[in-house]
Amino acid sequence: MIRFIFKHKKMHKPKELVFGQTIIQLNQVNGADKRKLIWLLIIKRSRQAFPYFQREDAVIYLDNAATTLKPQVLIDRTAEFYASAGSVHRSQYDAAQTVQYEQARTQVKEWVHAEDKHAVIWTSGTTHAINLVANGLMPQLNAEDEILISQADHHANFVTWHETAKKCGAKIQVLPILDNWLIDENALISALSEKTKLVALNFVSNVTGTEQPIKRLIQLIRKHSNALVLVDAAQAISHIKIDLQDLDADFLAFSAHKIYGPNGLGVLTGKLTALSQLQPLFFGGKMVDRVSNDRITFAELPYRLEAGTPNIAGVIGFNAVLDWLQKWDFTAAEQYAISLAESVKVRLKSYENCRLFNSPQASTVVCFVFDGIDCSDLSTLLSEQNIALRVGEHCAQPYLARLGERTTLRLSFAPYNTQEDVEAFFTALDKALDLLQ
């Protein structure tokens, strides 16, 4: 039995670890040993928080870049909401739900250091958020304007801006990525001009886990143009403590399900001055101020961009998740997950026909192929041994083309993964390779 002793209820790190009858004072432990003990705490707290691990049919889940598992706090709060009556912003009897709903905006504001809680707009996910920006800016764009995207982008960015450009006549420029998978900064500088109206940037790749130097890229954009900047933070939100005001991005989009929240909920946030430029994508209830036979005026932000009945259960559940996440040592949890992924990369290098597509930084993502072996065949055999990973194009065909591959395999780790998961993966991998080679 492992028991964790907290000296104060508000403390996030334990002062003591108790193994059976043995008490270990953490302030008396140094270096690697202390780190291992903290990681034991992370594993235990992580796995206890997720009911998935109590299932008899639970597989080895190594697909966290696709979506994270759901903690009990989310399930409990969502069930509690559905057991009660009411919507939000509608009448007096739903006042408690409305308070929690709006508290979630404040939580998101504080989590990403947004400018104002009114700059937090609920969407169905990152894709919806990006489309909200694209559609909202379209009336301002014309054939003289240019939009910059990159080979590093997810289709949610890449396709959306291509289609937007078609509709308004604007020109698309696709920035190349270098052999280290970072955006070519010289190409960015060359592409920027007074015609550049928007630059869409991918913060962290869902393919290789590569983190772009977003702050430096935005500084270059500010220096060489007056363009608006949109950051796709879908993969960054669960790994990086984002400070939106420090980044100086105009728009930032992410999905709740990437950070232990519910499916079907996302966030668009950014500068109020930038968000105020957006024309609504949808029209209807809640997004209006006054309506008469011949005149309609829209509500202020954020409501003017949130037409219709929102995902109330999702928002309130996400509020509980963010409150729960405040109790984590975010940096230690991330370092632990990275350590698992990096150990896998080291071991995969020992396989003669394995090729890795590593990011220049340590990350929780492992992207690889085996020469002469079909990725789908290998994935199928791993799946049959209860290993859940991702195979395919990862909604990033231009990125895969840059890698020179049609498909790749991807593992992605979270703090609830264990060394036992790693061993199970390699046991399954060796069996699969014996059948395929």
UniProtKB/Swiss-Prot annotation:
Keywords: Pyridoxal phosphate, Transferase. One of its GO terms (molecular function) is cysteine desulfurase activity. The lineage of its organism: Bacteria, Pseudomonadati, Pseudomonadota, Gammaproteobacteria, Pasteurellales. GO terms for biological process: cysteine metabolic process. This is Probable cysteine desulfurase. It catalyses: (sulfur carrier)-H + L-cysteine = (sulfur carrier)-SH + L-alanine. Belongs to the class-V pyridoxal-phosphate-dependent aminotransferase family. Csd subfamily. Its cofactor is pyridoxal 5'-phosphate. Catalyzes the removal of elemental sulfur and selenium atoms from L-cysteine, L-cystine, L-selenocysteine, and L-selenocystine to produce L-alanine. It holds the Pfam family Aminotran_5. Its EC number is 2.8.1.7. The modification N6-(pyridoxal phosphate)lysine is found at K258. It comes from Haemophilus influenzae (strain ATCC 51907 / DSM 11121 / KW20 / Rd).
